[in-house]
């Protein structure tokens, strides 16, 4: 049984320019107080072919965690251009993935992935993208309404565990009432291919 369940994730500035920070507001419920802090990370998937290019944009610790509904704001900078695998327009424009992860006692218990579309707003640039990326004219749109949620078993503070399959929450477990249903029923549009994100875990990635 998960002691912590995400109720809602908002991206306060969406869509935005590519180089703008990501400003999230995360609401979660703890069914019991926690001894340690929760650790959160935001990861930008730079390449579908290698986790080498994943960028951890920022991380934070949140605590102490009382029982009940909790919320916090989490801001992270945009990905660094020089750490991207390529700055060719064909590689920058289009769809990639960002991932929010949450861990307790250094063990990840949930990750939420989102598609991110990178594009030019200017019609002329859309039709004829310049050979050199114009970063100041790039925009992004996170498909915040279409999350992909993966949960992992965690021992928490010696809490009793339900039976699980492959380390994930049992399918019969229902989300807390009043939460965002998209966080518990989170389809991604096909087709997809598999890409490995930070930490060696899989995340869905759209095909080119």
Curated annotation (Swiss-Prot):
Keyword Transmembrane appears in the UniProt entry: no
GO terms under cellular component: chromatin; chromosome, telomeric region; cytosol; H3 histone acetyltransferase complex; nucleus
Principal location class: nucleus
Alphabetical list of Gene3D superfamilies matching this protein: Histone chaperone ASF1-like
Key words of the record: Chaperone, Chromatin regulator, Nucleus, Transcription, Transcription regulation
KW Nucleus (keyword) present: yes
InterPro entries the record matches: ASF1-like, ASF1-like_sf
Taxonomic superkingdom: Eukaryota
Localization per record: Nucleus
Known role: Histone chaperone that facilitates histone deposition and histone exchange and removal during nucleosome assembly and disassembly.
UniProt similarity note: Belongs to the ASF1 family.
UniProt-recorded name of the protein: Histone chaperone ASF1
